[in-house]
């Protein structure tokens, strides 16, 4: 007997407009009414995936960062695979030699080494154009997108300040880099 259905989010549940179609939503609701558990697997972080699913009133388990973290329907973390703490300083040193922003996804949420203004510029000049290229049929409100990213990020002047808070690091995502 089937007890759990697992689905990818991007390109599977989400259509080319990055939306869940009415037909797919009805199927999800029917599955859940039958008592089957639904697990959404995504490369996205938990907060972005949860926000999207909440917009469609879908309550389910979420495996984010490609399965590195798993959360239940209540938002409780069931599993996490972190980057070993002893490796983080060297990684930050290497990434710090690159002329780009990088996003550090941790138990504190999204962390950025640098200023809000610099990160906003990075989002505007690199991330938004890349999203528009990848999803040409999707309408993206650049100002809202950037404001939301800035509101949800924690900013640090350097890696030592971040590491002094002892967060568990899940993923470090580096932008287009020009390393020295």
Regions from the PLM with identified roles:
Residues 173:
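Active-site rim beta-loop-alpha module in soluble metabolic enzymes
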Residues 1, 57-59, 168:
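Short loop/turn motifs at secondary-structure junctions
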Residues 1-2, 33:
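Short, Lys/Arg-enriched, disordered terminal segments
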Residues 177-179:
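Conserved small/polar residues in nucleotide/adenosyl-binding loops
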């Amino acid at each position: 007997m089937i007890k759990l259905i697992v689905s990818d989010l991007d390109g599977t549940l989400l259509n080319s407009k990055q939306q869940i179609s009415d037909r797919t939503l009805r199927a999800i609701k029917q599955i859940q009414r039958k008592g089957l558990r639904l697990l959404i697997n995504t490369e996205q972080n938990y907060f972005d995936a949860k926000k999207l699913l909440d917009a469609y009133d879908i309550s389910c388990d979420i495996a984010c960062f490609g399965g590195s973290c798993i959360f239940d329907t209540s938002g409780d973390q069931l599993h996490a695979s972190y980057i070993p703490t002893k490796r983080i300083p060297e990684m930050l040193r290497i990434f710090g030699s690159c002329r780009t922003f990088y996003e550090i996804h941790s138990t504190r949420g999204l962390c950025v080494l640098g200023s809000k203004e610099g990160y906003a510029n990075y989002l505007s000049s690199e991330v938004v154009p890349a999203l528009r290229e990848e999803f040409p049929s999707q309408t993206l409100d650049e100002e809202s997108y950037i404001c939301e990213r800035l509101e949800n990020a924690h900013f640090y002047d350097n890696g030592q300040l971040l590491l002094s808070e002892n967060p568990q690091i899940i993923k470090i995502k580096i932008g287009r880099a020009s390393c020295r």
